Amino acid sequence: YGIHCNTLL
């Protein structure tokens, strides 16, 4: 959660 470039995946 939010670990890859501010993604919510």
Curated annotation (Swiss-Prot):
Function: Transaldolase is important for the balance of metabolites in the pentose-phosphate pathway.
Record keywords, A-Z: Pentose shunt, Schiff base, Transferase
Quaternary structure and partners: Homodimer.
Sequence similarity: Belongs to the transaldolase family. Type 1 subfamily.
Gene Ontology BP, a term: pentose-phosphate shunt
Entry annotated with the keyword Transferase: yes
Secreted in keyword set: no
EC number: 2.2.1.2
Enzyme class at the top of the EC tree: transferase
Annotated source species: Cyberlindnera jadinii (Torula yeast)
Catalytic activity: D-sedoheptulose 7-phosphate + D-glyceraldehyde 3-phosphate = D-erythrose 4-phosphate + beta-D-fructose 6-phosphate
Protein name: Transaldolase-3
Coiled-coil region(s): none
